[in-house]
Amino acid sequence: MRDFVIVFGSSSAITNPHHHHRRCYATAPESNRKTKSNSSFTKLLPSLPQQHSPSPASVSATHSLSSHFSNVVRWIPDGSLEYYADFASKLAEDGRIEDVALIAETLAAESGANVARFASMVDYDLLSKGISSNLRQGKIESVVYTLKRIEKVGIAPLDLVDDSSVKLMRKQFRAMANSVQVEKAIDLMEILAGLGFKIKELVDPFDVVKSCVEISNPQLAIRYACLLPHTELLLCRIIHGFGKKGDMVSVMTAYEACKQILDTPNMYICRTMIDVCGLCGDYVKSRYIYEDLLKENIKPNIYVINSLMNVNSHDLGYTLKVYKNMQILDVTADMTSYNILLKTCCLAGRVDLAQDIYKEAKRMESSGLLKLDAFTYCTIIKVFADAKMWKWALKVKDDMKSVGVTPNTHTWSSLISACANAGLVEQANHLFEEMLASGCEPNSQCFNILLHACVEACQYDRAFRLFQSWKGSSVNESLYADDIVSKGRTSSPNILKNNGPGSLVNRNSNSPYIQASKRFCFKPTTATYNILLKACGTDYYRGKELMDEMKSLGLSPNQITWSTLIDMCGGSGDVEGAVRILRTMHSAGTRPDVVAYTTAIKICAENKCLKLAFSLFEEMRRYQIKPNWVTYNTLLKARSKYGSLLEVRQCLAIYQDMRNAGYKPNDHFLKELIEEWCEGVIQENGQSQDKISDQEGDNAGRPVSLLIEKVATHMQERTAGNLAIDLQGLTKIEARLVVLAVLRMIKEDYMRGDVVIDDVLIIIGTDEANTVSGKQEITVQEALVKLLRDELSLVVLPAGQRNIIQDAHCVDDADQENTKSFVSISSTRRPAILERLMVTKASLYQWLQRRK
């Protein structure tokens, strides 16, 4: 074997064997070693390329390194591997492990070199010392790539990394996993996994997954999961992490990757995926996962089915379908299944089904197959509470005690709520006392339910007495006993020491509420003060005091608080105060919601401030707050009659907006207002307005919305141009209203200076006379001719017969008589169906002059 010489700079003096010629190598001073590279050779070492995308610069550097290395290496025929092994060990001791890897790679490239013998002769202790030295300097990347390179020549990397080095690696990997370097960390861990290292010991897997979720990189998280032994568990963690973030795209990417990695569907992953669909509100995808399992003839377990029913609990029909299919698949329901079914019935308000499910669960409990828990009893009690079936709720409480299940705080809250919803304040108080006697600590919800029951029963004084006693008020504290108001009532204040039996705070220290304040810490919430605000009635100043007290406790008023305060002003007719509070919400940093705006609009409408009400409506639309049904209905009912075309157009625009938003307006109320406005056209002629109602039977069963939409369409058109009235499909009553509405619009536009420049064309229909629709069109035509000619004295001609009357500004009486005769003959003989009618411009002008 030939020997070779490598020219390195080193602080260690390497002595050749005695049969070699002695060479002297210049060494760098000790002080320079800390600031400069260890050798001139290492300056030429390229930086390690990235594993997946080596840069062109690194490739060229590697090429130049090879050419340089061939220049400094020459083989010596009588050399031995002991020298080079000793040389590599000395380099490792100096921490120059990359140079050691370069020697090993060069030996491996020489066909005559015994690489295995070289690997056995290297001092592993010195090499391990060099690796540890690099790790202490934070060179984790250099260490990993060096281990990969020397592994190719037979040096086992696991033998070089001791416990102290593992601790150093763990420290650096944890720092990288919690930063933007998580991708580099996973690249290095993939290399170490290939070398046999246990990746789980290097870093907390959950930290890596968290970092991948933060940078929205599901592929990177999947790569890391494949390095660990229990891949399925970490895959579930990945899916759940992206689900909590609401990133459904990354969730689906991770799920599809799971299906590629795993041979068969994993129930744990399927369950996690269904739960995540619920978190993201995409319940449809949860159904697809379940259906895919059934298509593959895979029976889902009880946990998958329970998750599916829970995610779809808002859909009673689908949940019951899954439950029945579970029985077909012979999957035994557990207690969680029944709890979810009860929850579904509660959301759907199906008390009957909840009773049946509860009885079935009780039957299975008596058979020893199930054990009902507190959640089951609490859920069924809530079902009865929402349905105001308080007797059934109390019966369930007795069932609980009979089987030894102790009611918890949530159970007591549901029981108190059941009586409160039914208006049984005394029974609710009795349950609260029973709760205290059992040693169960009430939460804020229990207190709030009891306060709400008092307020709903108009027991406002009692609500404030309870509130003050729960706060642990002293009997010597000055409280206003009569400064509590009912709706529309305000009383003068009296000091507590002068109070009689009706004072705010009972002096009896044995009261269970006083005892509760001593035993438990009652912390009022924003909801507590919202309830008390309702008890203030119209006393704005009392409500303002409560708001100030709430703020002093560090509680922030929410939208309900502000809306209640606005309504308080409305009760006293203070429109300006209500609007001022609405403006204060903006300055306080609380964005008004639809309830706040609707409350203010309602106050304006009730006090006949319609301009301000419509202004607030436009303002809420500018803030992109969607009106609800109450908002639209309040505005449509704000007027008892219409006075101008602008008002009609305004309300019709709101009507159309309401229908487009999916709400059903009160068509009959709006129709009556439009009828009154339209019939105003002929009031001056002394005609009765009962003409429409006389024939109301003709419109039986027809939607009123069709008429209103027709009116709204024509109200939006300009009358200055050529106007056509389309009456196709309308009855004679509806056609009458539309024509009157257009004439009213023409009149008001004329009063503002708009001149009629053309005839008005009325389109009736195109059907034949022997059809049902054709006969209806004839009836409509006759009714319109009678309205326009007899009641309004307008000239009506069949379209195309304009030449019968000369185009003049005035029509004499003879011409009027001729026209009447023509129309009368045409109506009587009916030689043909008149599809269109025309009201002449001249007669319209005369009619407008008379009206003016």
Swiss-Prot record:
Transit peptide residues according to the UniProt entry: 1-25
Positions annotated as PPR repeat: 334-364, 373-407, 408-442, 443-477, 525-557, 558-592, 593-627, 628-665
Principal cellular location given in the protein's record: plastid
Disordered: region residues: 17-60
Molecular function via GO: mRNA binding
Superkingdom of origin organism: Eukaryota
A Pfam family: PPR_long
Protein name: Pentatricopeptide repeat-containing protein At5g02830, chloroplastic
Protein's organism: Arabidopsis thaliana
Lineage of source species: Eukaryota, Viridiplantae, Streptophyta, Embryophyta, Tracheophyta
